[in-house]
Amino acid sequence: MEPIPLEAEKPGSCPEPFGGSLMNRGSFLFVESNTTGTGELLMKRARLLGFETYLVTRNPARYPFLRDSVAQLIEAETRSPDELVGVATKLSGLAGIYSSSDYFVEAASSAAMAMGLPAANARAIATCRNKWKQATELQRHSIPIPETWLATSIRDVENILAHGTLPVVVKPVSGSGSSGVRLCDSAAAAIAGFNSAKSVLQDQVDLPSPDILIQQYVEGKEYSAEIIAYDGKLHCLGILAKHKGPPPCFVEVGHDFPAPLLEPSLQELASFASGAVSALGLEFGPAHVEFVITESGPVIIEVNPRLAGGMIPVMLSHALGTSILDMVIRLYAGEGFTPPRGSARAGAIRFRLAPTSGKLKSLGFSRNPDPTVPEAGLLKSEGGDVQIKGDFRDRVAYAVGVADELDAAAAAADRMIDSLVIDIETAADESDKQDPGPGEGRWALHPEAMKLLAPPIEISRDGRLLQHQAAIDEAHLVMLADQGLVSQAAAADLLKHILDLQDEGFQSLEGRDAPRGVYLAYEAELAARAGPEKAGWLHLARSRNDLNATISLLVLREAACSISQQIGIAQGALLQRVEEASSLVAPLYSQYQIALPGSPGHYLLGVFFALGRERQRLHSLLEDIRNCPMGAGAGGGTSMPIDPLKTASLLGFEEPSFNSLDAVASRDHHLHGLSIFASISTLLSRVAQDLQVWTTREFALIDVPRNLAGGSSMLPQKKNPFLLEHIKGSASTVIGAYVSAATATCKAPFSNSIEVSNYGCSPLRLSEEALQRALILTSLIVKGMSFNVRSMRDHLEDGSSMTAIAAERMASRGIPFREAHTQIGEIAQRLSQDDCATQRRSELASQLAGVFPVSLEECRDALQFGGGPGKRSTDDQLSVAKTHFREMELKCAEISERWAHAEAHCKGRVKELIDKHRSTCRSGVCG
């Protein structure tokens, strides 16, 4: 069936029944606008209401609809309220100033206030627009929000993730329309999201976004509340249920009104959302409140000081029977506000997202709308380019359904949007028609072999590798351009497409077949976007061999740093507990036998120092990863006059590899790293073994809280500290990963090989995940466990643990230690086990008068030499531990800062090349 293009239903069309008048009511100034959705429609409605309509913008090219717009165009700097006031004073009979764009509502409000026109408080809008300030203000008013952090550097991101729990949401502090918002389930994804979020607003509206928000991801169904503030009251137009596209993006693909909840719940949610609006000081105009309903109640995600986007007002207008857009225009024109009557109808809106990037060959609906679909429209034009951005710009069409029941309205919208026919021609489609060249195209892997060895790309699995691949490409292209081996025009074009791929989270590669590996699939996508001629320069003077070797070191570097940070968190938890636990008395064991009086603090310090050595080994490993393999090619270098030192420094290495064969053949850093991981997991397993034994009734030295334990499916009395078993079990995975990698490597030739580059390196991810899990669980247990003080003392009550001190005191009085040891041993053997512990201790004190310690504390504190648990010794150990901890934290921060500086320098060089090329093109000398 041929698609029906619905030419008349352009985006932003609105049915006429909502009223209108062409009488002259003065002028109305729009400051910038939504580029899709209701932006154009607001201007049309203002004109129909009788206003002379003006649009002031700093960049008319942002608005394709201006060709047919009813608005008169004014060019000015719209980020400056003073310039806006200058524009406004020249308009006769100005009734109102309004902006439908998140980015300009503050400036528009400031200008309106200066002109004495209706407006929201500009300071309140500024607080809302800065989502970090918004979060702080909502917290101050005890309104539930996700745990929120501010990040201005990669180091900030790493520190946040070290103390937070994945997944997290990364987004610009002042963004809109889901632009730059990403769900991140790994540190690599969060860092990539951070980098992408910093540049996304520059690309959209030429606004920098140096500050990035990181929020704990909140699980639950998402909703929004549409609120109008007027005359001291907050009016909720409705609660809507939200539908989102696939993660990691947050593109909204549908809304249902009213949300399918009971009426009391809807009223409570309206009150909840209004509370957030009130807390932020928004006393005039529309507010769009987004929230999630969790098991413990609703949580505010963000409050936007403007009318909802995404055609929500159009759908609400049809459902409520009155134009929300007219309502807002009249409000800002000073004509007041009358709340709409209660809805007798339900509404739903559905969007279709572009499935891929490319040229839009055809787009249209294959069915006519029925009476339950009052509006459907296209958001893209045939012949135009579509680029997947992971935000509102990915939408290509919408359909509104309205009916008496929500199910019927949703079904109508679904039917209409499902009838959309879309045909996008990707550059890859064109390249597929070409005959394969003499390179990789000659090789077609057998389908069975491909199924086993080359599964389709999964971003959740391969995204980390792709991020490193893109970073290497950036450094390599900058070097090639600087050396004059590739034209700056070709390098800049390729770099722009690489940035696009990064911004999109490589989503265009999701599900892509990769018969010869992820890299060649990635390169094919670049060729599809930039053209095979330009993309063909990317692989100059390099091979997959030096690429893979470099990626493996970047992955190892990242993993080792991440584990080091987790060790730091565990050490911090240990030090916290040492402070409170050093004054307690507890058994010190030797082969599960009570040996001496010690303290929990002494034990925890022992674990701290052992972890500290492991962390130092990791730091030494990171310092050793100094040579970058790039430039080694397939193992024999290259004849091209490259600058490997420049590539190395841009990637955070200190120098290139000295020997090309060593560069591609060696994976000793991996084996070393895996061996350190194995050693750490062994230590954690031993600690977990102790703690598990100490939770038993027979020992009863510690207890773990209920939220770190489990019950039994059969035994009602059982409290199972099963997390400790996970820590012990993780060791088998980590140790196994080392054995697997060493076994894969030991019989491989000293050159590039699949055994080394694949099987020798792939266990790292499994090892890192298992060790991360063990470290996090260890930190939780250490923080949460409690000490059973009475039980600890009871185990020492019989005095036997004090006899070693008595023997040493006898030796200090001239009796040979072996003789004293024998005498006390004989006394201890004669004690009756039938007597109670107190009687046995009393008997020992009687027979060893003068040398037997008076108390357990005296005995423990006597052990002050050789790093014992005595108070003076423990205080000294704690002081040393704190110093070591601070020094290592600084060392780790320095090395992370070095990498971040290299990355920022590389990104700066990339931007410099791209900007220079753009400038050249504008001058008409584009190559």
Swiss-Prot record:
Top-tier EC class: lyase
Subcellular location(s) of the protein: Cytoplasm
InterPro entries with a match to the protein in the record: Argininosuccinate_lyase, ATP-grasp, CbamoylP_synth_lsu-like_ATP-bd, Fumarase/histidase_N, Fumarate_lyase_fam, Fumarate_lyase_N, L-Aspartase-like
EC identifiers of the protein: 4.3.2.1
GO molecular function terms attached to this record: argininosuccinate lyase activity; ATP binding; metal ion binding
Domain ATP-grasp intervals: 135-333
Chief place of localization: cytoplasm
Pfam family, one: Lyase_1
Keywords associated with the record: Amino-acid biosynthesis, Arginine biosynthesis, Cytoplasm, Lyase, Plasmid
Catalysis performed (reactions): 2-(N(omega)-L-arginino)succinate = fumarate + L-arginine
Biochemical pathway: Amino-acid biosynthesis; L-arginine biosynthesis; L-arginine from L-ornithine and carbamoyl phosphate: step 3/3
GO cellular component terms, semicolon-separated: cytosol
PROSITE patterns tied to this protein: ATP_GRASP (PS50975), CPSASE_2 (PS00867)
Region (Argininosuccinate lyase): 431-927
One of the GO biological process terms: L-arginine biosynthetic process
Record-stated family: In the C-terminal section; belongs to the lyase 1 family. Argininosuccinate lyase subfamily.
Official protein name in the record: Argininosuccinate lyase 2
Name of the coding gene: argH2
